[in-house]
Regions:
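A charged, aromatic-enriched C-terminal amphipathic alpha-helix characteristic of glycosyltransferases
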Residues: 304-335
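Nucleotide-sugar donor-binding catalytic core of glycosyltransferases
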Residues: 2-53, 63-70, 78, 87-93, ...
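Proline-aspartate-enriched helix->loop->beta-strand connector
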Residues: 75, 79-83
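Conserved acidic donor-binding segment of nucleotide-sugar-dependent glycosyltransferases
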Residues: 284-292, 301-305
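Active-site proximal beta-strand in glycosyltransferases
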Residues: 98-112
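Short acidic loop-to-helix transition motifs that present clustered carboxylates
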Residues: 112-115, 155
Length: 339
């Protein structure tokens, strides 16, 4: 009988597809099912309904109950041997317990616990729970519970080198509006390097947060004020001499997906420091800064010098140890199953 897995996770980015591909290469029959946040399904109608609702909690609970019923029905019809859940904040304990009766259930928290209060207690209802930040593993240990450190990863099918001109000096992709740290850092770079071509994708000034601020926002040539797809992101990285990676405020000790995706694309990365980043790249594979002075010096060096040797060493490491293929094999080892 062929091995089978049900993958459940949020629809954003390409993580469901990357996990599906990794399991498929290991000989698994794969069924994937994605959910939306903050309400499922996040259709135009539901988005409007949720926004104007006077009972958002009630509407959310109804959405959660409906999705959990759907998942139980899907589980019954597909009969997987493994249920692999990414984040899973929409799933309730009864659903997890139900699936655990007949399958191995593992959760991979792809965000930190501060962002996933609905997933915090999943550890009590699954076979294994993995965290992408060591401090979340430590939190569970303090509670007398066992969680496992499983960093994020690169989807190598999406992020890979392209033979195109590097016509952009510095680029960044990520949410900006809700991160003062990112805004402050990027604004400082724009001021310091006014003659360089700098391109930033991500919501910088949403129109719904003030139409006049949106119309009159500064540096429109830098801040594109929109999101781009994973494939477009890979192309942008390949066009860039330097790609910035600035972790959000809540990420204190770990690596976000961009860490590995930038490297996978074959671009030179400059990243803010934290203990895990410094441990992972201690031989100069990427530029790591602790303050703006170090950041500016790294940018100057990245623009003036050939960084291909650093890039090649970093990419070799990611392909060997930090792809989705590697992570799924680690999950199977935790479950004591052959990969």
């Amino acid at each position: 009988m062929k091995k089978s897995v049900l993958i459940i996770g949020p629809n954003y980015f390409n993580y469901l597809q990357a996990s599906e591909y990794a399991f498929s290469k290991l000989g698994y029959n794969v069924v994937t099912d994605g959910y939306d946040t903050p309400i499922h399904p996040y259709t135009s109608f539901m988005k409007l309904r949720y926004k104007v609702s006077r009972d958002k909690d009630g509407l959310y609970r109804k959405s959660v109950n409906s999705y959990n019923t759907h998942i139980i029905n899907l589980f019954n019809s597909t009969k997987p041997s493994i249920v692999f859940i990414m984040n899973g904040e929409i799933l309730n304990s009864e659903t997890l317990e139900y699936m655990r009766r007949d399958a191995k259930v593992v959760v991979w928290l792809y965000d930190n616990l501060e962002k996933l209060p609905g997933s915090k207690n999943h550890i009590d209802y699954v076979d294994k729970l993995c965290c992408f930040e060591q401090r979340d593993v430590d939190y569970y240990r303090e509670q007398g519970k066992v969680a496992y450190f499983l960093p994020q990863a690169c989807d190598t099918a999406t992020y890979h080198p392209l033979d195109i001109e590097k016509d952009i000096d510095i680029s960044f992709v990520g949410q900006i509006y809700y991160s003062p740290k990112r805004r402050d850092t990027i604004n400082a770079i724009v001021d310091k390097f006014p003659d360089k071509r700098i391109v930033v994708y991500g919501m910088h000034q949403p129109w719904y947060k003030g139409i006049w601020k949106w119309i009159n926002r500064e540096n429109k040539n830098v801040y594109k004020n929109c999101t781009i797809s994973a494939n477009e992101t890979n192309r942008l990285y390949n066009r860039s001499k330097i790609v910035l990676n600035i972790h959000q405020e809540a990420q204190k000790d770990g690596a976000n997906p961009r860490t590995f995706e930038i490297i996978g694309s074959g671009a030179y990365q400059i990243c803010d420091a934290n203990p895990y980043i410094e441990m992972l790249f201690k031989d100069g594979e990427i530029g790591v800064y602790h303050n703006k002075e170090e950041l500016f010096e790294l940018i100057k060096g990245g623009l003036q010098n050939d960084k291909s040797e650093c890039v090649n060493r970093a990419r070799k490491s990611v392909l060997a140890d930090h792809s989705f293929d590697s992570r799924i094999k680690q999950v199977l080892e935790l479950l004591e199953l052959e990969s």
